[in-house]
Amino acid sequence: MKIKNILLTLCTSLLLTNVAAHAKEVKIGMAIDDLRLERWQKDRDIFVKKAESLGAKVFVQSANGNEETQMSQIENMINRGVDVLVIIPYNGQVLSNVVKEAKQEGIKVLAYDRMINDADIDFYISFDNEKVGELQAKALVDIVPQGNYFLMGGSPVDNNAKLFRAGQMKVLKPYVDSGKIKVVGDQWVDGWLPENALKIMENALTANNNKIDAVVASNDATAGGAIQALSAQGLSGKVAISGQDADLAGIKRIAAGTQTMTVYKPITLLANTAAEIAVELGNGQEPKADTTLNNGLKDVPSRLLTPIDVNKNNIKDTVIKDGFHKESEL
């Protein structure tokens, strides 16, 4: 009986060792739009930590806001034999060919936060981006229900920027139609870069003799650039301005009263969930979707998370409570 038990233990041990030796390490290629932006640095760190805790290996590259660089980096990841591509696209309109290459190699593709259009991607995870725009516009009209509004969109090649604008206009249109709000300018900010937003805002102030009451800025980086221009004219804190991403600089401006609000998208939840989905895809599993979104080619299984309005009154109950920022940093 003892010999039988010993043999059984040995066989079980050998079997487990053999399974462990052949357990698949999922290789993930993470292609990021632009790591110069604080937002994506946080996503990367959280995603990599979670994916590695699930036994995956992650290769990260940043395109620094260049679509050709991103396509080249994705091709490089395909050649490295990754199992899954997680792509935060700079331009979601131009990646259909590299996605096709990936699919031909049996690689799964997850679009992270931004949709990839006209491509055979496997899954999409993001936030309800029209809702983001609605939160931005509503926060401003609650404070400035009439006056001159300037619309500062994000990158013209970012699909999300268009969704934010759709949400913004859903709120603003009745005010515009009634004549309460006048849109005195509408421009998109290349690369979401604050230096581009600064120039746009300077020109807008000049064109309107500084008579701007609210700026619908689509994220904190562009809000920061716009606020620089407003400050130079003595208008900082006097013009209502929105944001998004809950960047530390944006939260500091809200606390100081120079920025009205930001939209907090719980990035920890987004990145952790995306890592879980990527590993599931790499293991041949089918992640759970809560909806589908059409990208021009197919209805893509998707998971959309809920964004949160952050203002001076709820900083502690949102970004501080979640550990996204520390109170000592403010």
Swiss-Prot record:
Subcellular location: Periplasm
Annotated signal sequence range: 1-23
Gene Ontology terms: biological process: D-ribose transmembrane transport; D-xylose metabolic process; D-xylose transmembrane transport
Entry keywords, A to Z: Periplasm, Signal, Sugar transport, Transport
Main location: periplasm
Domain of life: Bacteria
InterPro entries: Bact_Solute-Bind_Prot2, Peripla_BP_I, SBP_2_dom, XylF
Record has Plastid as a keyword: no
UniProt similarity note: Belongs to the bacterial solute-binding protein 2 family.
Protein name in the entry: D-xylose-binding periplasmic protein
Originating organism: Escherichia coli (strain K12)
